[in-house]
């Protein structure tokens, strides 16, 4: 069983992609996060056994895409990085510059690099932030989305995990093809924690108690 065999990654690297005059660049950040997830920080996933189980099930599943959406400051980026730490040695690539999605040459370089890594057996994992405008419609000029679809299904499908993060307020805004069964593991909406949920989260994290009188972002 994947969940029982899992051992947190003690040390790894996140390759963050940059855009410059010479094309796609790459930096390296050490990732020492052991991948421990506070399930209480993500109450919307409790019905699936908690965030830890949900993420492990995604990593073990054949589907490629996991879509995070919702208000800023609600924990999307944090859970993305937790997933990276639990990814069993995948080559993790972070993109948070929309220019890489918008410029066809850069988008093609990114997808080409992913295919090369996959062919070398490095099992790439893409963490794609700020994708709001680029996952909504398959239109002229949106080369990134078209290539993303080819990565995640069909004859060109690669062994890749893709986590999308946007500030969209409704999953219906995401292109239906990205949500297709077999391609997508699911959508997760990130919302504010209720006062009771926030208090419980602080208690579990062994933080100083605080009284909340209204819903708050996880970042608060």
Stretch-by-stretch model annotation:
Residues 132-165, 169-180:
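Conserved catalytic/switch belt of AAA+ P-loop NTPases
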Residues 30-59:
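N-terminal pre-Walker A segment at the start of P-loop NTPase domains
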Residues 49, 88-121, 142:
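Short glycine-rich substrate-engagement loop in P-loop NTPases that contacts/grips substrate
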Residues 188-198, 202-220:
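Conserved AAA+ ATPase small/helical "lid" subdomain
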Residues 175-193:
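A short helix-turn-beta junction within AAA+ P-loop NTPase domains corresponding to the substrate/partner-engaging
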Residues 1-29:
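Interdomain "pre-motor" coupling segment immediately N-terminal to P-loop NTPase/helicase cores
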Residues 90-91, 121-125, 156-164:
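Loop/turn-to-beta-strand initiation segments
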Residues 61-80:
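Walker A/P-loop nucleotide-binding motif
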């Amino acid at each position: 069983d994947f969940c029982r065999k899992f051992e947190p990654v003690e040390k790894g690297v996140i390759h963050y992609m940059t855009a410059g005059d010479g094309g796609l660049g790459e930096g390296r950040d050490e990732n020492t996060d052991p991948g421990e997830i506070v399930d209480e920080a993500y109450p919307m996933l409790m019905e699936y056994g908690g965030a830890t189980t949900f993420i492990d099930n995604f990593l073990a599943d054949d589907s490629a895409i996991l879509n995070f959406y919702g208000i800023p400051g609600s924990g999307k980026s944090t859970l993305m990085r937790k997933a990276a730490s639990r990814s069993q040695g995948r080559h993790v690539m972070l993109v948070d510059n929309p220019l890489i999605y918008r410029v066809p040459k850069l988008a093609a370089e990114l997808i080409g690099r992913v295919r090369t890594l996959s062919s070398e057996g490095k099992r790439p994992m893409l963490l794609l932030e700020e994708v709001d405008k680029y996952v909504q419609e398959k239109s002229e000029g949106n080369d990134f989305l078209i290539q993303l679809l080819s990565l995640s299904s069909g004859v060109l499908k690669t062994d890749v995990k893709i986590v999308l993060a946007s500030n969209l307020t409704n999953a219906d805004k995401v292109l239906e093809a990205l949500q297709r069964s077999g391609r997508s593991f699911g959508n997760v909406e990130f919302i504010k924690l209720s006062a009771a949920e926030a208090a419980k989260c602080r208690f579990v994290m062994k933080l100083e108690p605080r009284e909340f009188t209204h819903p708050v972002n996880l970042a608060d």
